[in-house]
């Protein structure tokens, strides 16, 4: 999968802040498992899941890539298209959190 394919899938999950993000976290965990990356999924607040993945050797140092998957509700916003479907218009991509965390997560996963 390329970055745009991953982003399209991530945006399709309705991870509105007061709802669960479990299915999205499981999707990412399964995606990483294809590359032999071990993950841990654990629940923070009820219905809100965190995913921990570690790549590389057990040595001092390293880097942490951290993000969030929740989005604010779209009610009352003037979306012309479905905010949970990635749309390309004039060489730009539109979708809920396409340029925020879901975009970042797609780049990291690609």
Which role does the model predict for each range below?
Residues 1-98:
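Acidic/His- and Gly-rich active-site-bordering loop/insert found
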Residues 97-110:
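Active-site alpha-helical elements of protease catalytic centers
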